[in-house]
Amino acid sequence: MRRKLVAGNWKMNGSLAANALLLAEIKAEFGNPACDVAVCVPAPYLAQCLSLLSDSTIALGAQDVSSHDSGAYTGEVSTAMLLEFACRYVIVGHSERRAYFGETNELVAQKTVRALSAGLMPIVCVGETLEQREAGQTDEVVGRQIDAVLSSIAENDLAKIVVAYEPVWAIGTGKTATPEMAQEVHVMLRRRLHAKNAQAATEVRILYGGSMKPDNAKELLAMPDIDGGLIGGAALKAADFLAIIRAA
């Protein structure tokens, strides 16, 4: 049985003071959850959060990584740098990276390969826009996104990735896919994974990343192919994040 994963994506939020308060509040009520938990924080705060989480089972993650190893790539962060801060996870291909920074399926695949080669666990994000969903293109668009990654990685690396389905139309809009709508896409993704490596496909965790909140987490997480959540806004509020963790 797949152990669920709840990963908080802080996006471009936080401060030294706010981070310390948030993590202190989470740790105070954390207990011994039945799921894995991670926080993916802005790169400048990795050192601070590594220190704050040193006595916790909460894993540390980054929000992006360079497809390059090192060199003259101003502003980029390499896998080696992330490893120095004990990162376990790294988000690749988030819808905001695709929409605002022009990241292509090919670049996302390259970043995934780079992360895997360094021993990081990439959280590979896929998802469709409202326009694409209304045009009946969900399977086509999301399928292309995941296939670009699957065709680039070795068969025996499949079990080392996490997939996150984030319907773009449900992020920050207040709209949420019904559990059944989300499950339908997760099943499609599982089938794609199965075609790559049948055994590994049963082990890969597929997270839901479309505005999971305390009031919908339990229903979403009850779906057989929803193996956790990639949490945005709710990860910035200790009570909300803890409620989702408990629902998992």
UniProtKB/Swiss-Prot annotation:
Pfam family, any one: TIM
Active site positions, chain numbering: H94 (electrophile), E166 (proton acceptor)
Entry keyword Oxidoreductase: no
PROSITE patterns (alphabetical): TIM_1, TIM_2
EC id: 5.3.1.1
Binding site for substrate: N9, W10, K11, G172, S211, G232, G233
Biological or metabolic pathway of the protein: Carbohydrate biosynthesis; gluconeogenesis; Carbohydrate degradation; glycolysis; D-glyceraldehyde 3-phosphate from glycerone phosphate: step 1/1
Signal sequence region: none
Cellular compartments annotated: Cytoplasm
Catalysed reactions listed for this entry: D-glyceraldehyde 3-phosphate = dihydroxyacetone phosphate
One example of a Gene Ontology biological process annotation: gluconeogenesis
Keyword annotations: Cytoplasm, Gluconeogenesis, Glycolysis, Isomerase
PANTHER family: TRIOSEPHOSPHATE ISOMERASE
Family to which this protein belongs: Belongs to the triosephosphate isomerase family.
Its job: Involved in the gluconeogenesis. Catalyzes stereospecifically the conversion of dihydroxyacetone phosphate (DHAP) to D-glyceraldehyde-3-phosphate (G3P).
Assembly and oligomerization: Homodimer.
Protein name listed in UniProt: Triosephosphate isomerase
The organism of origin for this protein: Herminiimonas arsenicoxydans
Gene coding for it: tpiA
